[in-house]
């Protein structure tokens, strides 16, 4: 007598389903407040943690699928999707966050146009001026604490660091240091330019210096042979070589 057909669900499939559920939850948390005009807090740490969790779980599922089938296309597709998610999060934090918009009450008391106010208080074209005046002098004068200074400077240094992993593996031309550096500088400058046009956040040449400098430093670090081999293994899913 024939046994009834039973379809086996592999562990990698269950893991990928779990990652998909978490991704849906992330998407809902991003869209729901905008649809309902609700001032729901979306802490940066929680958003980043959820997105990192999605990436780690889905990568594990893709790796197990590759080990089972020998097909690495899913792993490479997932890593490309992670790059897209990273770019979305970056643009969301720099251009679309409601906290970046000017406070209308300040404009009323300033007695000037929105553009004039923004250009006066949120634009800096002098290299290292904000780093020195806002952070170093601010810390020395007691206006900001050490933790705030370090967190903001490190945040700017780390913001574009993932580019050092993704760009050279997505496009071979980006493996040349000068091409990578030019791409990152232009990308950061484009974001700062959009902030200037949209009048959100601050348009600051020091952000270009810190963002691009951090990305290029990480690029050089990942060029160290053991780290370069590890990054290639992560990208291909082949840790045996």
Set out the residue ranges of the language-model regions.
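Bulky hydrophobic segments
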Residues: 2-199, 219-241
């Amino acid at each position: 007598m024939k046994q009834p057909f039973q379809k086996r669900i592999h562990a990698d499939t269950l893991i990928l389903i779990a990652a998909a559920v978490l991704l849906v939850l992330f998407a809902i948390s991003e869209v729901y407040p905008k649809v309902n005009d609700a001032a729901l807090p979306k802490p940066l740490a929680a958003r980043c943690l959820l997105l990192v969790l999605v990436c780690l779980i889905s990568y594990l599922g893709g790796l197990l699928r590759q080990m089972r089938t020998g097909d690495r296309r899913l792993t490479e597709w997932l890593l490309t999707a992670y790059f897209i998610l990273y770019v979305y999060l970056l643009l969301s934090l720099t251009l679309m966050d409601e906290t970046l918009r000017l406070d209308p009450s300040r404009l009323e008391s300033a007695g000037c146009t929105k553009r004039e106010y923004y250009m006066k208080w949120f634009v800096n074209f002098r290299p290292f001026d904000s780093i020195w005046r806002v952070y170093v002098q601010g810390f020395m004068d007691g206006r900001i604490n050490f933790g705030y200074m370090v967190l903001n400077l490190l945040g700017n240094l780390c913001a574009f660091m993932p580019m050092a992993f993704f760009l050279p593996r997505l496009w071979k031309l980006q493996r040349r240091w000068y091409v990578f550096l030019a791409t990152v500088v232009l990308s950061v400058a484009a974001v700062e330019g959009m902030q200037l046009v949209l009048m959100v956040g601050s348009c600051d040449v020091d952000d270009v210096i810190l963002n691009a400098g951090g990305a290029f430093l990480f690029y050089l670090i990942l060029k160290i042979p053991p780290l370069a081999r590890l990054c290639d293994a992560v990208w291909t899913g082949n840790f045996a070589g």
